[in-house]
Swiss-Prot record:
This is Hemoglobin subunit beta. It comes from the Eukaryota. GO terms for molecular function: haptoglobin binding; heme binding; metal ion binding; organic acid binding; oxygen binding; oxygen carrier activity; peroxidase activity. It comes from Chelonoidis carbonarius (Red-footed tortoise). The keyword Hydrolase does not apply.
Amino acid sequence: MVHWSCEEKQFITSLWAKVNVEEVGGEALARLLIVYPWTQRFFSSFGNLSSPNAILHNAKVLAHGKKVLTSFGEAVKNLDNIKKTFAQLSELHCEKLHVDPENFKLLGNILIIVLATHFPKEFTPASQAAWTKLVNAVAHALALGYH
């Protein structure tokens, strides 16, 4: 179980309240696919992923990014029980989708970058530390289904 200070919780929840899930989620997933092109193999059904421009404007990428970030929002709502919150998603990604758990860390790092660019004033070093702790906790929870 991850232990959160009141300050960490405040950094996370106050910034999350400002996040446009559709915009930030789409951008984060698109960046993941551009920066780490080997992750595209999990999204072969999404159509044209042939260039950064194609990825950034791919409706399926943007929609799935929103879905991913909506799920991430469950971590924000359940900071004290992230493992349980992501148990089913962990099983899905492990047993059915066979996603390398390292990709969860990569996406978390990308999310940090996207949040920092969207909220430069709010994304102080202390806020970054709290968000880094959160994305690492989510990545760990999603990787628990791997044996």
